[in-house]
């Protein structure tokens, strides 16, 4: 792939010093930054630093996405106002981005005066142009909380596979999408009440307008990623299909956000004001720096505008956002760059396995943020492919590439140069053929970065590092140093090595900015730019005492990181044992803690205090977990806690189990359900009869604060008698 093939510069873009506005998606202001988020911010930051090193005028803009029902409810749960919540989360997010070297020119908030004014301006322009429609719609309404419910705040039974506790827009078990009205036995996740249907006036952006379709068909042809283009064409359909639907841009009070002009009690949906927040953050920066904001966003602007996003929000950024801008009289994005998702060790991030890793826990564990920047960069390319953080590979790659190949070059040469040659390089050594090779590679490496082919850039850089190490191994400076007669050769070897190290540092600077800063201080040079490839070290400027730039990853640090992020899970064996000891046939197991369902509170506290002994896989293998079907269920006379379950576990006869779940279920609710039982628990003679096992149920660690018991139900397809393993 030649540099001419790296087409990140759009046709017609200004040459020379370019003016570029860059954004990453806005993190939502009700949770922590985790390593999945960091993929995008690191990817964007590397690109921004690359362009800064070219000398372009570039601004990297971000903000917290602050509006919506989830923020409002989270604040209520914490006993604070939404503004207090988002101010605290902003500080946490800013801290995390700073820790990982994400170099925003401005990190702001969507809950700002700038964003309110811009959102209103764009809305009113769209309304004036005939793109806003007003309609009566019927929605789910929580009669207890007196609020309309977003789809994700309604749960119930999937109408297709009958999985319980599925969201109001799609089933996570079978993948079916549907309307909230299709759910069986729906309930509000806010209050638990059954929602009722209620009508309300809403406002829509008329994406179905033929003008939108015509514009978007033309705009999509400029997207850089074929996957994005294909997806957009799928959404648009063939000409005349009219597949685009109007977009509901309003929400009813109570809602944390901006009220729609001329519509009391109606608020902009968060996805309208969130992308406008890009411009609001930039406007805030322009006002502080004296920049001409309008010159960057007006329709005839010659500036460039790029959005880095995850592929899950492509729909909003390639349909709604460009159409909003086009028909409100603003410039549209030059391009949108989408990336894939992150897995850890080949699986989704998991709290129970400790792989749902927060940015702060990574820092608190003592891991170097530039290790993660390097590893993500090595995996990233210009496509929407998912990437995997394999923790063994992470350790091996960092230790091999960054310490073994790269940093080691400086440590091998600096000592000799300082002791023997006053820290000054040999002028003639700067013409060595190896250095010419490195200098010649720098433009292509920079081009790979600009094309978002970071993996290619780093592979080429490490190939060059291998060549430099081969040169050092061949020259053997440690042998040359033994004989004063070899002083000239030793001086040359050390000088070539340090200049090569400078060039490798230049190639790695977008990825390792803090290491590069340390290198610049060590070599006594100005901040490196791409133009400096041809400006070698000077004998006039002695290098300084070498300071270690990077250490190796210690496996114990990885273990500590996983432990810090792992949910407190009690072993199944301990839960079963506790249940049997208390004479109950029901146990529980979940990420918040596990205990027998009818244990006294004191026993529950002991079960959840993290003091349970670690068990081996052999111990766990002793437990026979089976799928069981509840064929009959009845209350136990004389007990206010127990239900008597008759279970089919795939044997010739059914089993009788007493379970302490009466407070959570009526007998008729359980008949016909599948659940999970401990099938090899010793039968226990109880007052009410013989209990021949134990069914599993989940509960919170503190049942007084968070009451409720929930039996485990397998996905559809499981059959009585199947082993759970």
From Swiss-Prot:
Q: Which residues bind ATP?
A: 351
Can the keyword Ligase be found in this entry's annotation?
A: yes
Which InterPro entries does the record cross-reference, listed alphabetically? aa-tRNA-synth_I_CS, Anticodon_Met, Met-tRNA-synth_bsu_C, Met-tRNA_ligase_1, Met-tRNA_synth, Methionyl/Leucyl_tRNA_Synth, MetRS_core, MetRS_Zn
Q: Which residues bind Zn(2+)?
A: 158, 161, 171, 174
Q: Where is this motif: 'HIGH' region?
A: 27-37
Lineage top rank: taxon: Bacteria
Which reaction(s) does the protein catalyse, per the Swiss-Prot or TrEMBL entry?
A: tRNA(Met) + L-methionine + ATP = L-methionyl-tRNA(Met) + AMP + diphosphate
Report domain tRNA-binding positions. 619-725
By what name is this protein known? Answer: Methionine--tRNA ligase
Q: Which gene encodes it?
A: metG
Q: Where does this one sit in the cell?
A: Cytoplasm
Q: Could you tell me one molecular function GO term of this UniProt entry?
A: ATP binding
- Which enzyme class, named as a word? ligase
GO biological process terms, alphabetically, are: methionyl-tRNA aminoacylation
Write out the residue ranges of the motif 'KMSKS' region.
348-352
**Which metal ions or organic cofactors does this protein require, according to UniProt?**
Zn(2+)
Q: Name one GO cellular component term.
A: cytosol
